[in-house]
Amino acid sequence: MDDGVEAKPLCLTREQIDKQVERLSRRPEQRTLPDPFPVCPTVRMSKEQLEQVTKRVFYHYSEKHAEALRLAEERREKECGVASTVLSASDVDDIVKRLYYEGMERVKVGRKEASDRLLFKSTKVLPVISLKRFVNDMYLRGLEREKKKEEKLYEKYILPTEIPNLRISKSQAAESAMRLSRRHE
């Protein structure tokens, strides 16, 4: 595929290299984005205007909130009929100590009642039985239980199948024969 034309290596001049470096290192232009809400255009404000609006809204809210708290306090005092008073530090300490010690006393009483309930011991005296007698009684009761169980099973399943007498009379034999022959008819 050699047409006789030699491929020369690509050589750039110093000016071309500088142009390429400038092109590649240049920052892209800042594009302005279109308004995302064309029906209701965005309001553009300067930084000072934005700060003024923020301060106005914030201070307006703060004043409104403080006024609402003051009115609520007045309404509460009017409804309760008692105005709140500011207590001194020593009064506050006395109240805290009183409440603390009363609470500790309640806790102590509650713990004592709970331990009394938990550690309740019956006053009823239980009879003392020797171990040997106890084991023998349990063993004999078990034997008795097994014997009763055998008797009940015998009465339920074995006894109805036994023939009471090995000899039967002629009338009983005839009756039995009639009964057996009628079943197949």
Curated annotation (Swiss-Prot):
It comes from the Eukaryota. InterPro entries: Unchar_22kDa (IPR039963). This is Uncharacterized 22 kDa protein in aldolase locus. It comes from Trypanosoma brucei brucei.
